[in-house]
């Protein structure tokens, strides 16, 4: 994954994790998962509901927070 992609993903996912915002994650096959982001890295997201699921990022289509989230992206980027 490009560094520019990480510049957007990391602050967004980290804000969702820190603020314990419930999310709906839609997979590329149409399945909807719901829960809270427990952790993430370059390749996976740990999603917690009644159990913790490891979801591979390449399978994720969309992440939809239950409420608006403010997150900061580096001002130095050209995004």
From Swiss-Prot:
* An example Gene Ontology biological process: regulation of translation, ncRNA-mediated
On whether Nucleus is a keyword of this UniProt record, the answer is no
Q: Which GO terms describe its molecular function?
A: RNA binding
Q: Which UniProt keywords apply?
A: RNA-binding, Stress response
Among the entry's GO cellular component annotations, what is one? cytosol
Superkingdom of origin organism: Bacteria
Q: Where is the Sm domain?
A: 10-69
What Pfam families would the database entry show? Hfq
PANTHER family (UniProt xref): RNA-BINDING PROTEIN HFQ (PTHR34772:SF1)
* Assembly mode: Homohexamer.
UniProt lists the family membership as follows: Belongs to the Hfq family.
What is this protein's function? RNA chaperone that binds small regulatory RNA (sRNAs) and mRNAs to facilitate mRNA translational regulation in response to envelope stress, environmental stress and changes in metabolite concentrations. Also binds with high specificity to tRNAs.
Q: What is this protein called?
A: RNA-binding protein Hfq
